[in-house]
Amino acid sequence: MKMTFRWFGKDYDTVSLDHIRQIPGVEGIVGALYHIPVGEVWPLEDILELKRQVNKNGFHLEVIESVNVHEDIKLGLPSRERYIENYKQTIRNLSKAGVKVICYNFMPIFDWTRSDLAKRRPDGSTVLAYEKQKVEQIDPEEMIRRIENGANGFLLPGWEPERLKTIKPLFALYKGVTEDDLLDHLRYFLEQIVPVAEECGIQMAIHPDDPPWSVFGLPRIVTNKENLKKIINMVNSPANGLTLCSGSLGANPDNDIPDIFRYFLRMGRVPFVHVRNIEIHTNGDFEETSHRSCDGSLNICEIVKVLHESDFQGYIRPDHGRMIWGEQARPGYGLYDRALGIMYLLGIWDSLENEKRKREGDKTCSQSIQV
């Protein structure tokens, strides 16, 4: 298991690589090029500059999150061909820089969706939260205004200004697009890009929808175990993989997260994992919490145990954290609580490794634990 940390770059992040370097166990940075519009080719020289910054601080850059998919591809428009060719070239350029995994999603228009970016918890921290009634009572444009107002001036991943400026025409284009249509468009996309990824030694890793249900009437197709099976079977290749996110899938209590992790880990199709906890309320609303199992509705200990039992060799990162100790940062992406999350996850992993060594009669010093 390779521990990583998402970093938005020196121009977009309050968290520095120097600070991330002080978190024990972090080996790599999960990064992206945020100045390149969605659908355009990522220039090799820009990728190499990002890699240089990351390597200079002792980290690897082997996971990219995300190379976002242009709406024309999701809509299945004739113009998708240009954007698919651009995507292929971006894959090739990333492979030249040593990237191994590309995380992406296939959510129409909106990426992750929340009603609040700073809901106050009983302990005084603030978190991302989703209240269904609030979302149902506003229109998409109001949602955009709320997200922008709550972003503390930061660019939020998945909420690119160039896309959100065309919100009304986009909704008109999606009128009548069904889940089956969206699945067909994803299949076409995968049939085009997976062979390129395979040639380049890269694993594509689709991220679940967040939350895992329809928002504003838009179709969602990456929401449960059955959806994930369909996607894996669209193109039977190791390069067609999954990003398993406990918090995204876990927002629906019908999703058995340890079972989902166990099933796809056994298939060898999970190169990347996000772990976070959420508290699900009786009415279906949810809010994010610390990573501790007892603080939310998900059994993080059991999830890490499944990773350990599966001999997970891929990449993992703590997902959204609370805003604590007066930190002012991009909502969900401060330094302190994500660092706490890493120590919790590694603590569980180290404990499992220690028990494994005891069973095997190995008294090797704990410093030899590989994470």
UniProtKB/Swiss-Prot annotation:
InterPro entries: Man_deHydtase (IPR004628), Xyl_isomerase-like_sf (IPR036237). Keywords: Iron, Lyase, Manganese. It holds the Pfam family UxuA. The keyword Magnesium does not apply. Its EC number is 4.2.1.8. It catalyses: D-mannonate = 2-dehydro-3-deoxy-D-gluconate + H2O. Its cofactor is Fe(2+); Mn(2+). Pathway: Carbohydrate metabolism; pentose and glucuronate interconversion. GO terms for biological process: D-glucuronate catabolic process. It is an enzyme of class 4 (lyase). The keyword Manganese applies. One of its GO terms (molecular function) is manganese ion binding. PANTHER family: MANNONATE DEHYDRATASE. HAMAP family: UxuA. Catalyzes the dehydration of D-mannonate. Belongs to the mannonate dehydratase family. NCBIfam families: PRK03906.1, uxuA. This is Mannonate dehydratase.
